[in-house]
């Protein structure tokens, strides 16, 4: 299966990290495929879900059948809502944890999305040969697209254009309450209510819904129907000309048309409504001759509006694979930075020019970069099946000085491209979900700080601190923790330091400061009027103020030097979690900077440090270099005996 790319072109653009597993899991069957390169989908196989106790068992069977080795990345479109780590299928008995499944199968990535979200992402790429228009109407470019499809359930989704990409909507719109449009549908509703307290559109216009319609009409006509009659039998009888089956199909298509019209006006889907799922394609000409389109347009005052919106039947054989492939590709691109990650792009560009042995090292770096970063050269050589000198030659072929230099560049390529976004924690999130969100939010905030921090101001602050006669750290509430941490670090430099978290003590101490003294004020809001008045007193006496705060705050504007740590916090009323981490990081940066200044070979400074340490009872040999090692997250200085 190809999306239009020529075979030779596809062969030239195979996924560097190996084939990707794609899956389309419905209530009845699980379909699997391998994507060897962009748009090149092969080895499509279908497995009845009832034959496998778990989804993991079905995936393992498929991987065994196609004789594939390791798969690094996989994406699953599933006929079920996906909200968090736990998935419990509505129309099947499979229940699983996404993360536990990923670990059990040894995947680096396992993405699970709603099947109609995946199908929606396939719509912009469909060709005329992969869809059939029903009725009139012309789609408007760059407009919202609606998607629906009866299968075991009634799937619903939509696509919203956003610049040069599309955003898929996750929806459970099939569970909207069914509203009959005529007496026959009233009868169907009354029949369905005997079994279901809430009759949704899914109950009457998904696959099993045709059975309800058929039996309701049979009960009206006082006809006996065998208990084992299913939708496939009804469709077969309709194609054979059976009057009751034909009426059931007609009623089914009419209800589907009403639902499609509801979806179109709800979304404003001027880009068209697409119909997927497994039921409608089996109706063939019965659907084309049905009242579907007439009922789609039957919206009274909005009839003309709907008449201009086209409706399409998707005829592509496995369209969900196209969509889930696109979602997985975007996810991986966001994670690795795509072409923006220079080191990975360099490896790909150079690969064909390398020797066969060096290519094996290149493939290891592309497919398992963290192994390269963390492993010693002997393990890297063993995993790539090359000699250790070959590993070094590979690094130098890329313009690196050696393995250490290459590891550093590779690590930067990985860690420097984490998406800078903020994820909201929701009630009901599992530990896996909210733990990952807290960590991701913190990492993203630190990376944003690295990108936007004014390092010229950092240098100025370090110079001020290094030459200070006395340093006082002020922080109120949560910021007092940061002030205490700073005091603990800076007093080791032999500079008189203290931390105050009480406004009265801050005011009393600030009144004693003067020229040569420094206050480091830590505040998320930067607006506390009492703190600002204290700082004004100190600055009027000649003291300098370094502010660690948000930009454009009164504190930032007053300070001698402002180190701005802007970020997204969940709620103003909450305990400031991310700001505390960023403020602690800023203290680390300042402390390391001062330690570097004081570890330099300056005789006068070294003598002053020695005198300070002697007064503190420490050995003069315990130099600032030891403190630097400790501050920069090396080993803490050993205690002197």
Swiss-Prot record:
Q: Write the Enzyme Commission number(s) for this entry.
A: 2.7.1.2
State the family named in the UniProt similarity comment for this chain: In the N-terminal section; belongs to the bacterial glucokinase family.
> Which Pfam families does this entry report, sorted A to Z?
Glucokinase (PF02685), HTH_6 (PF01418), SIS (PF01380)
Question: Which organism was this protein described from?
Answer: Burkholderia thailandensis (strain ATCC 700388 / DSM 13276 / CCUG 48851 / CIP 106301 / E264)
Task: Quote the DNA-binding region ranges, renumbered to this chain.
Answer: 377-396
DNA-binding: is it a keyword of this entry?
yes
InterPro entries linked to this entry: ATPase_NBD, Bacterial_glucokinase, Glucokinase, Homeodomain-like_sf, HTH_RpiR, RpiR-like_SIS, SIS_dom, SIS_dom_sf
Q: Return the annotated region ranges for Glucokinase.
A: 1-340
Q: What is this protein called?
A: Bifunctional protein glk
Q: Where in the cell is it found?
A: Membrane
Annotated ranges, domain SIS: 461-600
Q: Which reaction does it catalyse?
A: D-glucose + ATP = D-glucose 6-phosphate + ADP + H(+)
| Chain spans, region Disordered | 1-21
What membrane topology was assigned to this protein in its record? Single-pass membrane protein
| Putative HTH-type transcriptional regulator: annotated span | 341-641
GO-annotated molecular function: ATP binding; D-glucose binding; DNA binding; DNA-binding transcription factor activity; glucokinase activity
Q: Which UniProt keywords apply?
A: ATP-binding, DNA-binding, Glycolysis, Kinase, Membrane, Multifunctional enzyme, Nucleotide-binding, Transcription, Transcription regulation, Transferase, Transmembrane, Transmembrane helix
Q: Which gene encodes it?
A: glk
Which top-level group of life is the source organism from?
Bacteria
Gene Ontology cellular component annotations, sorted alphabetically: cytosol; membrane
Annotated residues for binding of ATP = 23-28
Enzyme class label? transferase
Q: Does the keyword Endoplasmic reticulum apply?
A: no
């Amino acid at each position: 299966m190809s999306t239009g790319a020529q075979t030779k072109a596809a062969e030239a653009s195979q996924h560097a990290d190996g084939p990707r597993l794609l899956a389309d899991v419905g209530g009845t069957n699980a379909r699997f495929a391998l994507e060897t390169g962009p748009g090149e989908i092969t080895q499509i196989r279908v497995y009845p879900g009832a034959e496998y106790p778990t989804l993991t068992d079905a995936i393992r069977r498929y991987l065994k059948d196609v004789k594939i080795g390791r798969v690094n990345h996989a994406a699953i479109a599933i006929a079920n809502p996906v909200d968090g780590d736990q998935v419990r299928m509505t129309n099947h008995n499979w229940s699983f944890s996404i993360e536990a499944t990923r670990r059990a199968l040894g995947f680096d990535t396992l993405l699970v999305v709603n099947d109609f979200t995946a199908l929606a992402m396939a719509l912009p790429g469909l060709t005329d040969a992969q869809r059939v228009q029903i009725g009139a109407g012309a789609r408007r470019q760059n407009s919202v697209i609606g998607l629906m499809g009866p299968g075991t359930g009634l799937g619903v989704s939509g696509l919203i254009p956003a610049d040069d990409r599309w955003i898929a909507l996750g929806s459970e719109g099939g569970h909207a309450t069914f509203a009959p449009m005529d007496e026959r549908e009233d009868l169907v509703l009354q029949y369905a209510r005997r079994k279901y307290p809430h009759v949704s559109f899914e109950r009457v216009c998904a696959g099993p819904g045709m059975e309800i319609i058929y039996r309701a009409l049979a009960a009206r006509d006082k006809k006996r129907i065998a208990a084992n009659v299913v939708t496939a039998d009804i469709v077969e009888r309709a194609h054979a000309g059976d009057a009751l089956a034909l009426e059931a199909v007609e009623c089914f298509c009419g209800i589907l048309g009403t639902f499609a019209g509801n979806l179109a006006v709800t979304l404003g889907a001027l880009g068209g409504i697409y119909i997927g799922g497994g039921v409608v394609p089996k109706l063939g000409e019965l659907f084309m001759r049905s009242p579907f389109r007439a009922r789609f347009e039957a919206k009274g005052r909005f009839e003309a509006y709907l008449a201009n919106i086209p409706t399409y039947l998707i005829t592509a054989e496995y369209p969900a694979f196209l969509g889930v492939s696109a979602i997985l590709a975007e996810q991986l691109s966001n994670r690795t930075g795509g072409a923006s990650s220079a080191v990975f792009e360099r490896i790909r560009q150079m690969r064909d020019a390398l020797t066969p042995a060096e290519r094996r090292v290149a493939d290891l770096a592309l497919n398992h970069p963290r192994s390269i970063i963390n492993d010693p050269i002997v393990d890297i050589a063993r995993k790539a099946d090359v000699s250790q000198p070959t590993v070094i030659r590979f690094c130098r072929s890329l313009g690196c000085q050696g393995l250490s230099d290459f590891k550093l560049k590779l690590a930067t390529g990985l860690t420097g491209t984490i998406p800078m976004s903020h994820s909201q924690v929701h009630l009901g999130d599992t530990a896996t979900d909210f733990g990952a969100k807290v960590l991701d939010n913190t990492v993203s905030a630190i990376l944003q700080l690295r990108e936007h921090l004014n390092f010229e101001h950092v240098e100025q602050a370090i110079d001020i601190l290094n030459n200070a006669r006395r340093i006082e750290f002020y922080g109120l509430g949560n910021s007092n923790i940061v002030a205490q941490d700073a005091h603990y670090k800076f007093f080791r430099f032999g500079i008189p330091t203290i931390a105050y978290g009480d406004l009265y003590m801050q005011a009393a101490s600030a009144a004693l400061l003067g020229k040569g003294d420094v206050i480091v004020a830590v505040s998320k809001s930067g607006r506390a009027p009492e703190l600002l008045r204290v700082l004004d007193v100190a600055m009027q006496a000649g003291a300098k103020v370094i502010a660690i705060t948000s930009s454009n705050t009164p504190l930032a504007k007053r300070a001698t030097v402002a180190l701005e740590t802007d970020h997204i916090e969940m709620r103003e009323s909450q305990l400031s979690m991310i700001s505390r981490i960023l403020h602690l990081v800023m203290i680390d940066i300042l402390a390391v900077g001062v330690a570097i200044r004081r570890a330099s070979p300056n005789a006068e400074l070294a003598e002053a440090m020695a005198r300070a340490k002697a007064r503190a009872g420490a050995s003069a040999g315990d130099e600032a270099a030891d403190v630097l090692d400790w501050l920069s997250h090396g080993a803490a200085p050993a205690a002197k005996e």
